[in-house]
Curated annotation (Swiss-Prot):
Superkingdom of origin: Eukaryota
Sequence positions that bind iminosuccinate: H283, S309, Y392, I393, N394, S414, H513, F514, E515, T538
GO cellular component: chloroplast
Family: Belongs to the quinolinate synthase family. Type 1 subfamily.
Cofactor: [4Fe-4S] cluster
Keyword match Chloroplast: yes
Catalytic activity, reaction form: iminosuccinate + dihydroxyacetone phosphate = quinolinate + phosphate + 2 H2O + H(+)
Active site (UniProt): C133
Subcellular location: Plastid, Chloroplast
Name of the protein described by the UniProt record: Quinolinate synthase, chloroplastic
Transit peptide (residue range): 1-67
The enzyme's E.C. designation: 2.5.1.72
Biochemical pathway: Alkaloid biosynthesis; nicotine biosynthesis; Cofactor biosynthesis; NAD(+) biosynthesis; quinolinate from iminoaspartate: step 1/1
Length: 726
């Protein structure tokens, strides 16, 4: 008989002799306590008492009574209140794994929810909410200094979620801090409660994980307080509400200063753009002052677009079709080169393309791909055939052209690189893939595929339908990546930053660009597994934040969402605009719950310029300025808060270009994005050969397959050349 039935029939047992035990007991024996064997941890205890025989009866005494009652607490709290947490976990795992049917596991959770001690209403505050749960979950954590043990209270407005909380409280309430911190989220996977094979399974698994992460974060804080360790300084952040923004810290104040630009400057720029028929395409990473003005000017002149590098050229073509005679590119040089080449291909050679500086606007990543070392890497690694070079879009046309003549090449973005590589492996047997130039992204791709090799075929198929564990394991030794190329911005997310995020922001939403170092990548991937993170492009990051905000608004409860921004701080302008629009719309339409969104800048201690201000009397005052003091300004441990190259795209330069057109073209010759006059080693035009890998990518994005032309290039003999024009 299972424990659930025993609980239901306890009243019956109390009224009748127990059929499970012999009645031949010693008269007047003291009461005995028995525990019925059961996998159900809330115990059913039975007390048997023997009574003297009835003197009026002629029959042998058989009047023992056996009373059973359900005990509404966990066995670990009854007999071994301080049993090791790992031992409790094994008991809990055994219990749930013994339940074959998913519905039985749900019923068990529902029963556990009835055992969870009630939480006082005063603890159900927004500060005690557990982030990342689809239902409301509250957690209160305290520390018993005398016993050196943690105390946990939890509650939820969902009965199933209360069951999850009850299990975790039973494991960790009364545990030492070390025991709490030693438990890993993957340790909970064996409980198999998430294996319901139905809607909501992932969110159920996320509940285990997110409640545990919050328990651990608050445990660390209490232990640090007890040991007298000063709390680490919080990262700067911006809090966005329907009423506006609130910067936290000097760095955030510097960012926020430009989000609400002077209206006269906005009007002046918009009027110039309209008068001169100038379109503007700008990258997310440019200077926040310029972004603020451009974002406001979009309302007055529609031909302004801020995006990642891939979309910039497409928007430039759209602007040319709409009648723009000039395009101003706010980005690094390879972006303006790409815009120039794509406009030419689209039939708009007469449209002028202008950079924002008369000096070179470089890029550490593009420079790495233009080095002799990169071409040597391609020559060495491509000795095996068939081979394909997958090159990051953030490289020059020259790099794409020279590479394509060495190895068949397709470009990629951080949002489509995984699908591009997996599709290539699926379509071309025994393919060798050479990725470059970003070392961090290459390492992260390899790590992702390694993780996939341990997934189930069903999980792998959800990522790419043509792969399984066997195919993923077989492709790992055939994936290669360049070892000496990094973006100086994403290099900042190194050990120091990751340690602080893990310590103080473990329960926040984590966003990371695919180019960040491995530690930050792993941290964000772990968060992604429990629905609390995203790894991808700038557009992926923006979409993730908007989706989480929309979900929160739909829940219609007061909530504070915290996002760690694991990419260049210039993204904040687009984020504030998008989030502010969502919050403002909800506030005006419903007047319901208040949702606030905090964007955290994980700034390395070496990533800011500190300058004294004012007179010598103000020596103790320090201003924190986004960016670096000079040059690239990056330490060995990562120190760029923002891209120094992107910051060359100043508002004054943009105004100068606009004011000089059309009659001052001669003065702007150094600003113009020129066409390539050089040819490839095979004598072809750089623009023609360099654009072909981009066109291959566009075909892949449209069809989800490699173009037939590229497959033919991969399979053809190596000495026949690579481009279609060869």
């Amino acid at each position: 008989m299972d424990a659930a039935n025993l609980v239901m029939k306890s009243s019956l047992f109390s009224k009748s002799p127990c059929p499970l035990f012999s009645s031949k007991l010693i008269p007047r024996a003291p009461p005995s306590v028995f525990t019925l064997p059961s996998t159900f941890r809330p115990l059913v205890k039975c007390i048997q008492a023997s009574f003297p025989p009835n003197p009026d009866s002629k029959k042998p005494s058989n009047n023992s009574t056996f009373t059973c009652s359900a005990v509404t607490s966990f066995p670990s709290q009854q007999s071994q209140p301080h049993a090791p947490s790992d031992a409790k976990l094994q008991l809990l795992i055994s219990e749930f794994q013994s339940l074959v049917e998913p519905m039985d596991r749900v019923k068990r959770l529902l029963h556990y929810s009835t055992l969870l001690p009630p939480m006082d209403a005063s603890f159900k505050t927004p500060e005690n909410r557990v982030p990342g749960c689809t239902t409301q979950v509250w957690l209160n954590v305290s520390f018993d200094e005398a016993e050196n043990r943690m105390k946990f209270l939890a509650d939820s407005d969902s009965e199933i979620t209360k069951g999850f909380c009850a299990c975790l409280v039973s494991l960790l309430d009364g545990a030492t801090p070390d025991e709490v911190l030693a438990l890993k989220t993957e340790d909970l996977n064996a409980l198999n409660v998430a294996g319901l094979n139905g809607k909501g399974s992932a969110s159920r698994a996320n509940t285990w994980h997110n409640v545990l992460v919050s328990m651990q974060k608050r445990t660390r804080a209490l232990v640090a307080e007890r040991e007298g360790r000063p709390r680490g300084e919080l990262f700067p952040s911006l809090v966005i509400t329907a009423d506006g923004i609130q910067p936290q810290g000097s760095y955030a104040e510097a960012q926020a200063r430009f989000l609400f630009p002077d209206e006269s400057r906005v009007q002046k720029l918009a009027s110039l753009l309209k008068e001169k028929k100038i379109g503007v395409v700008a990258h997310f990473y440019m200077d926040p002052e310029v972004q603020g003005v451009l974002t406001a000017a979009q309302k007055l002149w529609p031909h302004i677009h801020i995006s990642d590098s891939l979309v910039m050229a497409d928007k430039a073509v759209s602007m040319a079709k709409a009648g723009c005679e000039y395009i101003s590119v706010l980005g690094v040089d390879f972006m303006s080169e790409n815009v120039r080449a794509i406009l030419d291909l689209a039939g708009f050679p007469e449209v002028g393309v202008y950079r924002m500086s008369d000096e070179r606007i470089g890029c550490s990543l593009a420079d790495a791909a233009a080095s002799p070392a990169y071409l040597d890497y391609l020559k060495t690694a491509s000795t095996s055939s068939p081979s394909l070079h997958v090159v990051y879009i953030n490289t020059s046309l020259e790099t794409k052209a020279y590479s394509h003549e060495l190895v068949p090449t397709i470009t990629c973005t951080s949002s489509n690189v995984v699908q591009t590589i997996l599709q290539a492996f699926a379509e071309v047997p025994d393919l060798e893939v050479l990725y470059g130039p970003d070392t961090y992204m290459g390492s992260n791709i390899a790590e992702l595929f390694t993780q996939m090799s341990t997934m189930t075929d069903e999980e792998i198929s959800a990522i790419h339908p043509l792969h399984n564990r066997i195919s993923i394991k077989s492709l790992l030794p055939r994936l290669h990546y360049f070892q000496d190329g990094t973006c100086i911005v994403h290099h900042l997310f190194g050990h120091e930053v990751v340690e602080k995020i893990n310590e103080m922001y473990g329960d926040a939403f984590l966003t990371a660009h695919f180019e960040v170092p491995g530690e930050m990548f792993s941290l964000a991937m772990e968060a992604k597994k429990r629905g609390m993170g995203v790894v991808g492009s700038t557009s992926n990051i923006l979409d993730f934040i908007k989706e989480r905000v929309e979900e929160s608004l739909n829940r219609n409860v007061d909530e504070h969402l915290q996002f760690v921004l694991g990419t260049e701080s210039g993204m904040i302008t687009a984020i504030v605009a998008a989030v502010g629009k969502l919050l403002g719309s909800a506030d005006s339409s419903s007047g319901g719950a208040k949702v606030s969104v905090e964007i955290v800048f994980p700034v390395s201690s070496e990533s800011v310029t500190r300058t004294s201000t004012g007179s010598p009397l103000d020596q103790n005052k320090v201003n924190i300025i986004p960016g670096v003091a000079s040059g690239e300004g990056c330490s060995l441990h990562g120190g760029c808060a923002s891209c120094p190259y992107m910051k060359m795209n100043s508002l004054s330069s943009l105004l100068k270009v606009c004011q000089s057109l059309p009659h001052g073209k001669a003065e702007l010759s150094a600003y113009e994005a020129g066409r390539f006059s050089l040819r490839t080693p095979k004598g072809k035009q750089i623009a023609d050969v360099g654009c072909e890998p981009v066109l291959h990518m566009r075909h892949f994005q449209a069809t989800k397959r490699l173009p037939e032309q590229l497959i033919n290039q991969i399979l053809q003999p190596r000495d026949n050349g690579r481009s279609s024009s060869a």
